[in-house]
């Protein structure tokens, strides 16, 4: 009897899984029946932009955390698919920091070519997953918004690829409830032009704080104040951008910081991170981990140690993205196809997790972290037939990216890198990022 595999989510990780199975089928392998459940009306996950916030057209929590004018905050050379280059997709090499629409088109191009859309049930959020140890089957309950019906089906494996950047972590501070300006989490941030002429407080010191603050600066915010809990971002910011230690409270429109300083602000943007949140999973199947490189309870970073018939994709903190999701998806595919044997001993799988955590914690150096994840990708690629690519070259692109950011945080996107797939150097974009106000694909591809 043919196995059945449920994939939850048709974002970059879920699409990688579909592509992995399609690749095996193309080579003559007998693959399971694949059903991918996607809550949105289209694929792409976070990259599927919507103007909506709060609830979507079906009354479901909006998944998208993307905003207008978003450009990649890392070089595309670090995420390029090994089996589908940017040059193949666009017919030429493109600059190194594409806007969201360009990356979405690239993601979509590969899965169109692979013809995997037939496996996806759109507008179909998963409501619940359960496991029966006697039958060794998962029961997945989903809702079809097109027919307004709820149904259940059984599967041999479940692959959770729902992501972990869609459920915001929203803190409360004294004075929030009486602040007369706008308070918005990064998840619901959509357009930097809303903050033109305003004094903006950006709470957080990670990538979303850096990028959203930069967007607001680019599109005319009067000033940016960013605050941090542990360490400042520390870049050479423009004159109207200041970093402060942790926010303590608000009185009226005045923000009070841990160093005793104050700042009047018109709007607050919470770049305070996201939660691993799986409302459709019972406690015994639900991953519980911090956002880190070595995820808790996942053997090889993907197989759930408490039930290794279940897998998770893309749950790590990420330097590598699309190509790491591919490496994971190919590995999971081969585990399901019986090409890779999982340890039968749970203790052995937990030991693997512990060893990865120990190695991650050995250094807090950024280069070490990048190399750590690169070694993880190499490990998975070596165990499958995923096309090998220059992973060390991708690391070099990341290292150069960090240098360029330190040199000029508002101009790092004007640099170019060499493709680790084709070896072609990216052209310099026709317009400096600070001046490129049109983020459309048509404008971007005019090189």
From Swiss-Prot:
SUPFAM superfamilies: FAD/NAD(P)-binding domain
Gene that produces this protein: tmm
Temperature-activity profile: Optimum temperature is 30 degrees Celsius.
Comment field (misc): The catalytic process consists of a reductive half-reaction and an oxidative half-reaction, via the formation of a C4a-hydroperoxyflavin intermediate. NADP(+) undergoes a conformational change in the oxidative half-reaction.
Residues that coordinate or bind NADP(+): 71, 73, 173, 205-206, 208, 229, 413
Annotated protein name in UniProt: Trimethylamine monooxygenase
Pfam families according to UniProt: FMO-like
Family designation: Belongs to the FMO family.
Function: Catalyzes the oxidation of trimethylamine (TMA) to produce trimethylamine N-oxide (TMAO). TMA is the best substrate, but the enzyme can also oxidize methimazole, indole and dimethylamine (DMA).
One GO MF term attached to the UniProt entry: NADP binding
Keyword Flavoprotein: yes
Top EC class of this enzyme: oxidoreductase
Organism: Roseovarius nubinhibens (strain ATCC BAA-591 / DSM 15170 / ISM)
Cofactor dependence: FAD
Record-linked InterPro entries: FAD/NAD-bd_sf (IPR036188), Flavin_mOase (IPR000960), Flavin_mOase-like (IPR020946), FMO-like (IPR050346)
Keywords: FAD, Flavoprotein, Monooxygenase, NADP, Oxidoreductase
pH-activity dependence text: Optimum pH is 8.0.
Coiled coil residues, start to end: none
EC number of the protein: 1.14.13.148
Catalyzed reaction equations: trimethylamine + NADPH + O2 = trimethylamine N-oxide + NADP(+) + H2O
The keyword Flavoprotein belongs to this UniProt entry's keyword annotation: yes
Residues involved in FAD binding: 13, 38, 40, 46-47, 63, 73, 126, 318, 321
